[in-house]
Amino acid sequence: MSGVKLDANRILVPVNGDKASEHVFRWACQLARQSKAHLHAVYVIEVPLEMPLESEIGEATDRGEEILARIEVIASEEKLRDVHARSLRARHAGPAIVMEAEDRQMDAVILGVPYRRRFGSCTLGTTSSYIFNNAPCQVIFWRERAPTPVLA
C-alpha cells in the first residue's frame, strides 16, 4: 500500500470486534502512517432505551475493553504510536459516531462493513447508512470481499 495518502489529519475508525472492523483498522493505521494523521478508534456501547444511559452493562463494557485492547495491539503491530482508542455509551451507534466526528473535528471516518447480500444486492446496515448521510467529513467504506464460491 505504499504511496497511498489520505488528505486528512484526523481519522476516526468505529470498531465493533468483527473481522471487517479489524481489517479496516489495520488499513487505517497504514493510511495514517503514510499521511501522518492522528488515528482515533471508537467502540460504542449501545444502551437499550428501557435502561438509563449510565447503566452498568458489564458484558458490553468488558467486550468493549477487549476490542479496544485488540485495536491497540494492531496499532503496535503496524508501528503506529499516535492512536486514541475509547468507548462511548449511546442509544444508537450511528448518531454517537457522527457526534464524535463533529466534536473531535475529524477529517474522515473510515468504516469497515461486512459483505452482506440481500435480495440480490449488497446492502449497508442502519449505522453505516446513518454515518454516510450525516457525518460532517469524508466517509470511506472498506467492504470485505464476497466469499469465494465453493466448487463441487
Q: What feature does the model see in each segment?
A:
Residues 56-67:
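A short acidic, glycine-rich active-site loop
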Residues 24, 51-54, 95-98, 121-122, ...:
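Short, well-ordered secondary-structure micro-motifs
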Residues 1-6, 76-109, 129, 146-152:
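Structural beta-alpha unit
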Residues 32, 71-75, 101:
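Conserved hydrophobic residues forming the short capping helix/wall of the S-adenosyl-L-methionine
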Residues 108-134, 148-151:
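Glycine-rich, Arg-bearing micro-motifs that act as flexible, cationic patches
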Residues 2-54, 58, 77-78, 82-83, ...:
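Small/aliphatic-rich secondary-structure junction motif
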Residues 43, 112-114, 143-144:
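Short secondary-structure boundary segments
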Residues 137-149:
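Short, flexible loop segments at boundaries between secondary-structure elements
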